[in-house]
Each structure stands twice: as structure tokens, then as C-alpha cells.
């Protein structure tokens, strides 16, 4: 920036994870974890005239991205997560308030103070320090977000696979389908079969080449030659398909290109 004679606006990504005895509740996102870290960084900013601090990001992943009412988890696990969330929120709010005070004392005027994610919109909205809310996956309301106690989103996206084989009377095999969500591995990262109301096979799951499922009900195959799924998280559809079909009352009302369709690969 200095070589180009420009001033580059920058934002700080500040860690708002909470460490409990024996449990690190959050993500390893930033080295700015406490007041001393932030003050040390602010102290060197005057030596960087080509940089202008304009924003702060404080993503509370442990609230926004961790399910607490998931059917695939036992009751004790869900109860523990809800307890940790409740105990995390006061720490997060206090730390954000301290961040605000430190920045004000340093004469920094922010354009935005960012926080939030799909699973934490309500709690972040109530945080006075935050001026900008972020949510991404919530636009699609994918399957992982069925597992939250505080909100129930309405599914807004999914995908269809062609059923190409019937290797057993109650087993149907789709072409492709291995569209897995990111993050820690587990069955909750698999696509969720919506139609017909069957279940994936434990030994195969959703595969790059094929996705078999078991269904003992009535299916007029090969006339009924498709299965409908919901993806688990957010990026799977835009990574795998060139465009999304926009449906309105059962009819195709338009088409929207994904970043794959635009020839983009960001990460």
C-alpha cells in the first residue's frame, strides 16, 4: 500500500473463544485473545501510515456454529453445549465492551464492529458493542441448523440426484452425491435425504460416484428416478453446481450462477 501511495483499510479479527477448565469452547481464529494483545498491536499502528484500522470482527463460533438440540447427539451432550453457551455469552459481551473501550482510548473510530453468525443472531443483536451482524448459512437454512434450540429456520435450498440403479428390493443407488460439509467429521456433515424418506447406508454414506439409500416404501422406479436431499452446511451447492434454480410455488422462476459457475475458486 505504501509503495502505491495508497491507504489500505484493515479490520482486526479478534478471538472471542472462552476457555473453561478442560474445555476450549470456540475456535483457533486469532492471536488477539486479550487486552494486552490488542494494546500491543495498536501501539505499532502509528508506524504503519499506509494502514487504516476501520473495523473489528468478533465471530462467536461457539454460539453460532455449534448445535445444541441435535437429534444425532445424546441429551447430555446437548445439555452441556447449552450450558457452555449460556456461560460464554457474558464473557463475550464483556470482552467486546473492553475492546470498544480500548479502541476509544486509542482514538480509533471504527466504521463497523462485526459479530454474529446464523446460530447467534439473537444474542449478538442484543450486544450493544456490535454494529454489524453477519450470517451466511442461514440464507439456505441447511440441515445442520435443524439442531438449534433457540430458532427453527425453514429449509430454502437442496439438490436432486438421479436414481440410476436398484441393487436390492429396498436399496436405490443415486449417481454422485458426495457433497460433504466442512468442519469436524461426522454423520451430521452428510447430505440429508428428504425424498423418499429413506436413510443412507452406514458403510457408504454419500459418495463421489454413488449414494445408495435404503427405502422400504413404495417407489415407482424407474419412473420416479430422483431423490431430494438437503446439504448440511452452506458451501456445498455453490462448490458443486454451476447454477441454482430459483423455485416459486413449484415452478422455475429463474437461475442464479454460483461462484463455480462464474469460474471462481476462492479457497
Where in the sequence are the language-model features?
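Active-site-adjacent beta->alpha loops and helix N-cap segments on the catalytic face
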Residues: 1-6
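Short, catalytically relevant binding-site loops at active-site mouths
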Residues: 118-122, 139-141, 147, 170-171, ...
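Active-site loop/helix belt of alpha/beta enzymes
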Residues: 7, 16-141
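Short coil-to-beta-strand transition motifs
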Residues: 153-160
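C-terminal accessory subdomain/extension
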Residues: 166-267
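Substrate-binding and catalytic surfaces of secreted/luminal carbohydrate-active proteins
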Residues: 104-105, 109-113, 160, 168, ...
Amino acid at each position: 500500500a505504501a509503495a502505491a501511495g495508497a491507504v489500505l483499510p484493515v479490520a482486526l479479527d479478534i478471538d472471542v473463544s472462552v476457555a473453561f477448565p478442560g474445555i476450549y469452547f470456540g475456535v483457533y481464529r486469532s492471536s488477539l485473545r486479550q487486552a494486552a494483545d490488542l494494546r500491543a498491536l495498536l501501539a505499532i499502528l502509528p508506524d504503519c501510515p499506509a494502514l487504516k484500522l476501520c473495523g473489528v470482527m468478533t465471530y462467536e463460533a461457539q454460539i453460532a456454529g455449534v448445535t445444541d438440540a441435535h437429534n444425532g447427539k445424546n441429551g447430555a451432550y446437548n445439555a452441556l453445549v447449552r450450558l457452555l453457551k449460556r456461560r460464554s455469552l457474558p464473557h463475550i459481551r464483556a470482552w467486546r465492551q473492553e475492546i470498544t473501550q480500548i479502541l476509544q482510548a486509542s482514538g480509533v473510530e471504527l466504521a463497523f464492529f462485526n459479530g454474529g453468525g446464523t446460530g447467534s443472531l439473537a444474542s449478538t443483536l442484543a450486544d450493544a458493542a456490535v454494529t454489524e451482524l453477519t450470517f451466511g448459512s442461514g440464507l439456505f437454512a441447511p440441515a445442520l441448523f435443524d439442531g438449534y434450540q433457540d430458532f427453527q429456520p425453514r429449509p430454502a435450498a437442496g439438490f436432486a440426484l438421479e436414481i440410476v440403479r436398484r441393487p436390492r428390493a429396498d436399496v436405490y443407488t443415486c449417481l454422485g452425491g458426495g457433497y460433504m460439509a466442512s468442519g469436524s467429521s461426522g454423520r451430521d456433515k452428510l447430505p440429508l435425504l428428504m425424498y423418499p424418506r429413506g436413510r443412507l447406508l452406514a458403510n457408504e454414506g454419500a459418495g463421489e460416484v454413488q449414494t445408495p439409500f435404503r427405502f422400504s416404501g413404495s417407489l415407482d422406479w424407474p419412473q420416479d428416478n430422483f431423490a431430494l436431499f438437503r446439504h448440511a452446511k452452506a458451501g456445498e451447492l455453490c462448490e458443486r453446481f454451476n447454477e441454482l434454480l430459483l423455485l416459486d410455488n413449484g415452478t422455475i422462476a429463474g437461475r442464479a450462477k454460483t461462484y463455480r459457475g462464474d469460474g471462481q475458486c476462492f479457497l
